[in-house]
């Protein structure tokens, strides 16, 4: 399933620090492969990795305000928390799945357990 962590509203030119996000992903999944070949607006930077649940992939929108995650929910929650930590506190961030079965605001300081509870309550 695909999940998204996306800035809601105007990001005022802000975009995620790609290097910091790459460092976090490679820190969790040491064998992660990074593909920086710009393939499309949605797939400007791609990370492929092996999780405990199987293969996973994350890719970044070229403006740096949306992270797409093709992973199991627990890995998507971890990635969304990392994305939130790298996002300015004054920007609103939403975490959802591709079918909008749930759509939750991801506040600064939210933990993985709290986000899991929000997702379970919304879904």
Where are each of the predicted segments found?
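Short, flexible beta-strand-to-coil junctions
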Residues: 8-12, 70-76, 98-100
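Hydrophobic side chains in well-ordered alpha-helices
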Residues: 17, 79-82
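Short, extreme N-terminal segment that most often corresponds to the first beta-strand
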Residues: 1-31, 122-123
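Short, intrinsically disordered low-complexity segments
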Residues: 26-73
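Short amphipathic alpha-helical segments that mediate assembly, nucleic-acid/protein binding
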Residues: 18, 76, 112-115
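Ordered hydrophobic segments in well-structured contexts
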Residues: 2-6, 46-48, 57-59, 66-68, ...
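Acidic, proline/glycine-rich low-complexity IDRs
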Residues: 81-123
